[in-house]
Amino acid sequence: TILQLYNFDAIVVEPAGALSMSALDDYKDKIKGKNVVCIVSGSNNDITRMEEIKERSLLYEGLKHYFIVRFPQRAGALQNFVSNVLGPHDDITYFEYRKKTQREKGPAVIGIELQHPEDFKGLLTRMEEQGIKYIYLNDNPNLFEFLV
């Protein structure tokens, strides 16, 4: 909601100020056909926090997903991932890789932004079809905060 207000209406609000609008999604069936007023308040928000707010919003909406992926340590491994795993509108927004010596595979932390939440299942299916082993970080808050 905060991002929508900012992106579409150039309104900067603090998280508490957008709470009433966020609640509309949860109550949409109960308030259908009724007149509803939402009070949007507070611009007590540091604009430098917008990136953090955007990140949390994308995670909440199911549009951003983080993984630890074990990549083969050979030329073209990332290109293979991009070509055969990512959908046409998927985007790698975070990538951290460390080459390991004397090993066939090395771990990479990857952040992938999807255009629609329903694209997630297809992403996982393509990873499995390509034999890619991964750890999903969004459901593991301790590891997520440590790595991302």
Predicted features along the sequence, with ranges:
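Conserved residues at beta->alpha junctions
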Residues: 15, 40-41, 72, 114
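A short, charged, Gly/Pro-tolerant segment at domain boundaries
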Residues: 18-19, 38-44, 142-146
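Active-site-adjacent helical/loop segments in soluble small-molecule enzymes
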Residues: 1-34
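Catalytic phosphate/nucleotide-handling subdomain of diverse soluble enzymes
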Residues: 25-55
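A conserved regulatory-domain signal marking ACT and ACT-like small-molecule sensing domains
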Residues: 47-148
